[in-house]
Amino acid sequence: MKENAKENELVKKLTNKHYTITTAESCTGGLLSATIINVSGASDVINCAYVTYANEAKENLVSVSHETLETKGAVSKETAAEMCVGCAKAAKADKIGRASCRERV
């Protein structure tokens, strides 16, 4: 696959700062992590990647509460926030951030 300048820049910046990244994805199906992993040198910055499409995976791997999934849905800002926090705890991350799909109507 063709490497994109933005992905290269991200990997370079993370490498220079000695940062690693862990992702937790759902509706993107691993596209974010795959895009980063496609860059040469990504093994220095990728810690792990969770693809938690099923609700059970969200609960078991990244600690999303069953209640949140039942009341807010799998594709909601609340679920995305819990995925972010759970992923960070599982990976023992120093910093967290998130990007999510638009909430479905």
Regions inferred by a protein language model and the residue ranges of each:
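Short alpha-helical segments enriched in small residues
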Residues: 1-104
